[in-house]
């Protein structure tokens, strides 16, 4: 019984360390970025967004859409693969793409004030 508890504790401790440890290579994308989302389908326009990356996590540093502040969230993998979510009031968009050391690009889709929109995004390190 004690052996099972000790084994379970060791497994949980190791899992917590693995989950919380951020690989050093993900830090190569850390910093501030200037992002632009361009609509290619629908009526959402061109949207400039301030973006930051810390430890592989994406967050917003500025920008608005339809009079709402934009909140960004998402991840950048060690290889530069990006998945992100943007929320501006009741509007939500999801995007995917890829980062290199100084720029990134991808696609997005979501809902604007007048219906569904989709397009491309690009980002450069500030």
What annotation goes with each model-predicted range?
Residues 1, 26-27:
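Absolute protein N-terminus
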Residues 1-10:
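Bacterial N-terminal signal peptides that target proteins for export
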Residues 6, 24, 121:
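A broad, low-specificity signal marking well-ordered, structured residues that form hydrophobic/aromatic
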Residues 9-18:
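Bacterial N-terminal signal peptides
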Residues 19-26:
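Sec/Tat signal peptide C-region and signal peptidase I cleavage site
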Residues 27-126:
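Central antiparallel beta-sheet cores of small beta-barrel/beta-sandwich binding domains
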